[in-house]
Structures are given as C-alpha cells and as structure tokens.
C-alpha cells in the first residue's frame, strides 16, 4: 500500500514536469503551497503540488517562490526522488565535472546515483541544471520502483516536444 501511495505521489509530481515546482532551496521550506506568492490555488496543478509540498517533496526556489511556469531540472527531480524514497547512502560522483560540491543539489545527485536512479549524460557530465525530459523523469521513476519497463508496451511519443 505504501509503495502505491509513493508511486501516486511521484506520478502526480512528474505530471507537473512542465512546471518548475522546484525541489531546491535546501534552507527554506514552505509549510504549505499557498505560502508561495506565485502558487495559483485554482490552477490545474494545485492539488498535486499542494500534496507534494505538504509531504515534503517540494520546497520551492525560495520560501516565497515555487516558479510553477519554469522547467524542472535533473537535480530537482533527483531531490524529489530522494525525498520520496528516503535515500541516505551517497555515491562518489567526483567524475562528474559539472556537479560542484558547493551546489545545493550535490548530495541529492550523489544519493540518486547510488540508488541507481540516475546516470550521467556522459562519463564526466551529469547536467544537473538542464531541464529534465519526460522520458528521463519516467525512467528515473521506473528505476526507483524497480519496474521492468522493457515489458511494458511502447507508446508513440512523437506529439511531445520534449521527447528524447
């Protein structure tokens, strides 16, 4: 039951990938979605984002901004997955030259790599600040849930501009 609840929450958040509902701002956490000045409680995403904030999956860009019209980055998705699954063991990610120890997401990327949900875009680049595509996001979720995604039917994604 808990796995289904986690899956539902992650899928709701992932469905909002056109939003930046940021996972960053490690030092400031809104208590509820309506604490963000740019949160529209009548928007189509309101229920899912409210649940994600209430459950500690989304923190926002700051204590007052969630940026619902921006892109979600690969680092932000890593943070959401780590918070969803309670990852605590980090990998050595020193080979990724674009992941600085001074960035808020350094530990989240290391946790996601150790969990097996993330790979670099190359042997030396993780691209944590790049927008995450739907395909990448769903691959991360499938890996986190240890799904055998090769056994599922393939769907034509040509209608989506962010397909990869």
Region annotations inferred by a language model:
Residues 2-46, 54, 59-107, 114-135, ...:
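Feature responds to low-complexity, polar/acidic, surface-exposed segments characteristic
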